[in-house]
Structure formats: structure tokens, C-alpha cells
Amino acid sequence: MKKYILSILITVLPTGLFAIAGFGLQVAQGQMKVEESVLGGADIPGVTLTNGAFENAFGIGAFLYVDIIPVIDLELDFQAMGNTYDINFVNPIGSMDPIPFAWATVNTYITVRKDVFSLSIPFLAAAKLYSGVGYNMHRTTPVANIEMVENLLGGDILGGDVSSLNENLEDFMTNEDNYDKSNGFHFQAGLQLKLLTFTSQLFYRYTMAEDVVPDKKGFGSMNFRFGFGI
């Protein structure tokens, strides 16, 4: 009898704790398509600055949720996401050595969630569909532009020496003081599965924020989480 009671407690206690809060890891597939941009040309004859195209992005991060407020849950997650592209520059003096660069963004999301539908096996497992809305903050590597390059060439974009421009431009764009900072809102919907103290989630999120993805006012992402209860 004692063994039977003990086995019930071992099962019930972690499950109860799991309902209070949880944490874990998160991976994401950013859904975006950034076209190649060519600056200069007709506006500045003999000068061309090209930022290459890229499609989608991979992200990784961590999350924390709290489930002690009636009706709603609160989530906080941090995520780094990125992809690579090339930067090229040409002026009448010569061509800059191409820069293999990374579009990268570090994101923080605060989300209020509400269950849409749920079912459970007492003390063992649960599943629920949910939706949520929230606020987000971003720090993103900048995109090279004509003004940026002109300043690095000492104000002479037509006749400036480009031999060390690739190093100077990369140093400028990777300096955190020059990152673009922005914020916005998002909505998401997904499925969460719980088994004892383990949880997994699969959800779609749409982020509405400027100055994150070049020339876009928002982007989508598919996200997967795996975590534990506390």
C-alpha cells in the first residue's frame, strides 16, 4: 500500500509543479525572402553597392513560461536568428573585395497566451491548442548603404581608395553600437503537448516590426520548443 501511495505522489507532484512554470530550448525557421539590392548606378555613375539576396533564416533560443494566472499564461523567450549574404562595392578607382556577411538579429518576445481547446489524461499527459499576442524587441545588424560607405571613404565615394574598405565596413557593421534597434507586436498560434514534467510546443508566429528584415515590415516563423516543468 505504501509503495502504491508513493508511486502516485511521484507522478502527481511533478505534474503539479509543471503547471506552475516551465523553461527550455527553442529552435525556429524564419520565413522571409530578401531580394538583392543595388544602390548607386544611375544616381551616382560609376558607383555600385550591392547587398546580396537571402531566403529564410535559422534561429535558436530559450523560453520561460508562467501558468499561475487564471485564464491566461505568460511567456518570455529570447532568440538569435540569422543568415548569410555577400556585400560588393565598385567605384571608378576599383572594386572592394566582397564581404561574406551575416544578417543577424537578437530578439526578445513577451507573450500573453490563452487556451483555445484542451484535453488531458489526469496526472499523465495533456494537449492544448492556444493563441497569443505580445510585444517584441530587436537588435539587428545594419544593411550597408551609400552614406555609410561614403563616410568610410572619407567623404569621397567616387575617388576613395577601396583597398581596405571591406575590413572597415565589416568592422563598422559588426560594432554593436551601430546595430539597428526596433520593437513591435506579434501574434502566434500553436499546439502544446505535456507528458509528466516534459513539454513540447509547435507554433507559428508573425512578427510586426520594422528595421529587422531588410525592406520588410514583418516576418513569419515556425518554432519548436522542448522543455521541463519547475
Q: What do these predicted ranges mean?
A:
Residues 1-22:
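Cleavable N-terminal export/targeting peptides
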Residues 19-67, 229:
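Short glycine/proline- and aromatic-enriched beta-strand/turn motifs that initiate or cap beta-hairpins
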Residues 19-23, 58, 70-74, 123-129, ...:
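Outer-envelope beta-barrel architecture signal
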Residues 27-31, 63-152, 230:
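Gram-negative (and chloroplast) outer-membrane scaffold detector with strong preference
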Residues 36-38, 81-86, 177, 182, ...:
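Predominantly the C-terminal beta-signal and adjacent terminal strand-loop region
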Residues 39-45, 89-96, 144-155, 217-224:
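Flexible, surface-exposed loop regions and adjacent strand-edge segments
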Residues 43-51, 93-102, 172-177, 209-216:
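Extracellular loop and loop/strand-boundary signature of outer-membrane beta-barrel proteins
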Residues 54-60, 102-108, 127, 181-187, ...:
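Residues that define the transmembrane beta-barrel architecture of outer-membrane proteins
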